[in-house]
């Protein structure tokens, strides 16, 4: 059965450091997600930059604290995988928590990867993808990169449990490797070697 999109809305936000516009947009998205019913089918497109655009701090974490930790991670030299592990542990929406909020509605996720390895859990910090690992991994990463956090934030990280596995299909639309393969094919078809 063909359905029409009832409405759409574009909200600009900041990248690579989250801002208040992103926070407000994420609150609206999360509240809308929680209203989904068993009869709804949510289609979610996620691509590079979503880790900073989707920002909703975990309980006990202030937006400014999360923003500060994010900025310190950006300047630390940590890999994107490690940054996204920490971002998930500080979030109400990442690491599959958006899919959990949408349940029992159906959800299908389409992804465009810009990260090495194309791990769906790391694209946008995986808001609709079950994350692996535990939040104590975040504490280890923060310690390794000498990023200090308060006891309140440490407690919040440890209490922010990952959701149960939700069976939701996800499809990779594009990766850097796919782009390179297509560019090479196009070049060969144009007579280049």
Where are these regions (language model features)?
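Short, small-residue-biased leader/transition segments that mark boundaries at the very start
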Residues: 2-6
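A structural-propensity feature for long, helix-poor, extended segments
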Residues: 7-20
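A glycine- and small-aliphatic-rich helix-loop capping segment at beta-alpha/alpha-beta transitions
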Residues: 7-10, 30, 34, 57-68, ...
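Generic structural signal for well-ordered, non-membrane alpha-helical segments
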Residues: 18, 22-29, 39, 62-66, ...
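Hydrophobic alpha-helical hairpins/lids featuring a short glycine-rich hinge
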Residues: 18-60, 72
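Short, acidic/small-residue loops that bind anionic groups at enzyme active sites
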Residues: 59-84
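A glycine/threonine-rich phosphate-anchoring loop and its flanking beta-alpha core
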Residues: 74, 80-147
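Accessory alpha-helical/coil subdomains and C-terminal extensions
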Residues: 105-108, 130-193
């Amino acid at each position: 059965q063909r359905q029409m999109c009832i409405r759409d809305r574009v909200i600009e936000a900041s990248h690579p450091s989250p801002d208040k516009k992103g926070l407000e947009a994420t609150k609206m998205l999360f509240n809308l997600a929680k209203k989904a019913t068993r009869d709804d089918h949510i289609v979610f497109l996620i691509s590079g930059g979503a880790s900073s655009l989707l920002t909703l701090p975990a309980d006990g974490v202030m937006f400014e604290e999360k923003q500060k930790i994010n900025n310190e991670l950006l300047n630390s030299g940590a890999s994107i995988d490690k940054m996204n592990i920490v971002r998930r542990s500080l979030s109400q929406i990442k690491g599959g928590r958006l899919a959990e909020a949408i349940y029992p509605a159906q959800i299908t996720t389409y992804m465009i990867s810009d990260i090495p390895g194309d791990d769906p859990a790391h694209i946008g910090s995986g808001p609709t993808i079950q994350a692996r690992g535990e939040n104590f991994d975040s504490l280890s990463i923060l310690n390794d990169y000498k990023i200090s956090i308060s006891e309140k934030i440490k407690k919040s990280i440890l209490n922010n449990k990952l959701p149960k596995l939700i069976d939701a299909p996800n499809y990779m639309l594009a990766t850097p490797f796919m782009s390179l393969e297509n560019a090479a094919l196009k070049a060969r078809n144009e007579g280049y070697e």
